[in-house]
């Protein structure tokens, strides 16, 4: 009887909640704050810059936070001789050419056909970058919604994983079906990490699988609808027992003068390491900032128990005012600023790829 009772309680705990009305979503706006909302209410939250997790279709465990494991990240850089030549291979012209193509999609909404097409385009670019590397993979991660996430895997000697991520979707806050070029949010971050990946895999040791750790680059679907893609990925990793030792988020890289180092819902030790990378490999100015609960995809990694860091384009309040509108266009962005973010990504990924963690 005790066994049956335990099984019944277990089943109850794992049962998915039922919406009060069809089509509503269960969102989380704080560690202990959940509520059901309509699509219109979700859109209003997005327009008001209120971060939230949409946990409607996530595992029940996704509503709770797993404390990230502590790692002793390097206190010094060790690979300047390898990294600095890679930085010289970064091209702002190439980055901006890719961004122009990416922002030419009418929108990249996660439930739109054009959101699927833009994801397929990202996949084709990634395949072109890593397709000839033995053991490397470029693949789609299918979800319950239309747009897939995209993942690049460059294997190392261990199964410990260093992740660099950016969300690929865009949204028009007034009407999800309307124009949303999303050049800055988040075409800039998506193409920044693509440019960094291109430089990174030109290194023979990285491409030859000689790195200590495996490197993954992610382009997440559905961030604007409640961090959907990144939640799905990191919750799946958590359930599979994968060890992600670090995650760097790049959400908006093209605007502002001083980068914002996000200190909430992130790992303090990894953030300190990230500042060291900025000081060593970039000329960027930066300052600490906060973006609130569930503001971007690093929060999904943090929630799943993985150390994460987020370097934003600016301190909050000095960022691009044109996001979530038809006016988020490429002409407002600074190619040199985006290149500094790409340098950060290359340095971060390379140093941690060879770190003993």
Curated annotation (Swiss-Prot):
Disulfide bonds join 291-295. Keywords: Aminopeptidase, Disulfide bond, Glycoprotein, Hydrolase, Metal-binding, Protease, Secreted, Signal, Virulence, Zinc. Its main location: secreted. The keyword Glycoprotein applies. Pfam families: Peptidase_M28. GO terms for biological process: proteolysis. Residues 1-15 form the signal peptide. Glycans are attached at residues 76, 186. It is found in: Secreted. Its cofactor is Zn(2+). Transmembrane segments: none annotated. It is an enzyme of class 3 (hydrolase). PANTHER family: AMINOPEPTIDASE YDR415C-RELATED, METALLOPEPTIDASE M28 FAMILY MEMBER. This is Probable leucine aminopeptidase MCYG_04170. It comes from Arthroderma otae (strain ATCC MYA-4605 / CBS 113480).
